[in-house]
Amino acid sequence: MGCGCSSHPEDDWMENIDVCENCHYPIVPLDGKGTLLIRNGSEVRDPLVTYEGSNPPASPLQDNLVIALHSYEPSHDGDLGFEKGEQLRILEQSGEWWKAQSLTTGQEGFIPFNFVAKANSLEPEPWFFKNLSRKDAERQLLAPGNTHGSFLIRESESTAGSFSLSVRDFDQNQGEVVKHYKIRNLDNGGFYISPRITFPGLHELVRHYTNASDGLCTRLSRPCQTQKPQKPWWEDEWEVPRETLKLVERLGAGQFGEVWMGYYNGHTKVAVKSLKQGSMSPDAFLAEANLMKQLQHQRLVRLYAVVTQEPIYIITEYMENGSLVDFLKTPSGIKLTINKLLDMAAQIAEGMAFIEERNYIHRDLRAANILVSDTLSCKIADFGLARLIEDNEYTAREGAKFPIKWTAPEAINYGTFTIKSDVWSFGILLTEIVTHGRIPYPGMTNPEVIQNLERGYRMVRPDNCPEELYQLMRLCWKERPEDRPTFDYLRSVLEDFFTATEGQYQPQP
């Protein structure tokens, strides 16, 4: 006997409890074929699902077969084009470009790894998301393009070999929310959410709950919609000729120079940062850029290539909504709820935790250096560039360009930049987020900020800022750097804060 509840502390699952009306014991599933034995020994099968015979085990020779999730048009010497649904055999699997052979044409070449999925597995299913966290499942389902009933199945974070169902729902009090169900495994290979009905495979489970909600918060409507992935950068293209870039639209100007939207080789949309001549040594920049390109994380803007002759160009991935400080002031940014604002802060903390783990330093962390995608994903830009600037207006604390209001006291006074001075800056960035881009220390000049900080002053709590969030800011502004929290701690607190404000899920009926 036993119930279907999850007791794992990390997961807020919908409870999967069904109790027999006669004996009042929890109902226990007995097999994985969609059947359930009851007292008179009769068999119950789900009338909403078409059951299929079990598939024979795949041949080891099929392990290197993949299916194209998207069509791909070749654009380099040596890459291989293919159509959506085409099968290919992987010949070499290394980096982000895999050598493959098309089973349709017999041709060989390199293919982008993120355009294909392993054949004879769950990966080609539009509703299956491999290696997706609970938090990222919520972000994806709440992104534009998804609606009530949009869903996905992902691998469980807490239990290896298990799965979770995440569904977008509407709550009268909270609005659009995502609810999670633990998909439980049977000993003989079947699955169930509610022990009233079991399934031989996830396909049958999805078909059943697409036909009827049957105790879930809503009927499953369609798989979570995602954008076609951007193909990886061609690995040999690092120092590129200036003529390979076409600058199309000037997006803005910052401390280091201008930023443009453009195209590389006429087909790849990129952002191009053009650095002011004399702003930094080309040799020092190239050395730093070689370090920066090793820092690859979903919360960091990807560095693709460089032009090392002055004016120096930095070519990165393009982020449709521009800088966070500007986006927060747009009509779309102003409408963001506190939950979404906190989620953006959690994303930034996640990226900075990666920088922290790699023993790197940003040195110029603020909302102007955070970029926002069209799905409201936040990524950190310009990490490491600040220390290369050779402009006295930027490097001296009296300089007009020095970001005094974001800089920790020890960095202002002694030039001591560490990951803990980045933590101070993150606390200031939090004020930018909750005020939708307001300049910190409103009404104060830079000299006044320095004088007040030396007297122990700290920025007051902004309007509409939760007290718990303000206390987190104050932790970031501790006088002694070693007393400030880690970015990993900040990430966990912000993610927990975001989850806690969603409220508790109701038990499944």
UniProtKB/Swiss-Prot annotation:
List ligand-binding residues for ATP: 251-259, 273
One Pfam family, short name please? PK_Tyr_Ser-Thr
Q: Which GO terms describe its molecular function?
A: ATP binding; ATPase binding; CD4 receptor binding; CD8 receptor binding; identical protein binding; non-membrane spanning protein tyrosine kinase activity; phosphatidylinositol 3-kinase binding; phospholipase activator activity
Q: Give residue numbers for the modification (Phosphotyrosine).
A: 192, 394, 505
Q: Where is this region: Interactions with CD4 and CD8?
A: 2-72
**Principal localisation:** membrane
What does the activity regulation annotation say?
The relative activities of the inhibitory tyrosine-protein kinase CSK and the activating tyrosine-protein phosphatase PTPRC/CD45 determine the level of LCK activity. These interactions allow rapid and efficient activation of LCK in response to TCR stimulation.
Biological process (GO) annotations held by this record are: B cell receptor signaling pathway; CD27 signaling pathway; cell surface receptor protein tyrosine kinase signaling pathway; Fc-gamma receptor signaling pathway; gamma-delta T cell differentiation; hemopoiesis; intracellular signal transduction; intracellular zinc ion homeostasis
How does the record classify its membrane topology? Lipid-anchor
Q: What's said on domains?
A: The SH2 domain mediates interaction with SQSTM1. Interaction is regulated by Ser-59 phosphorylation.
The protein in question is named Tyrosine-protein kinase Lck
In which organism is this protein found? Homo sapiens (Human)
- Highest lineage ranks of the organism? Eukaryota, Metazoa, Chordata, Craniata, Vertebrata
Q: Which gene encodes it?
A: LCK
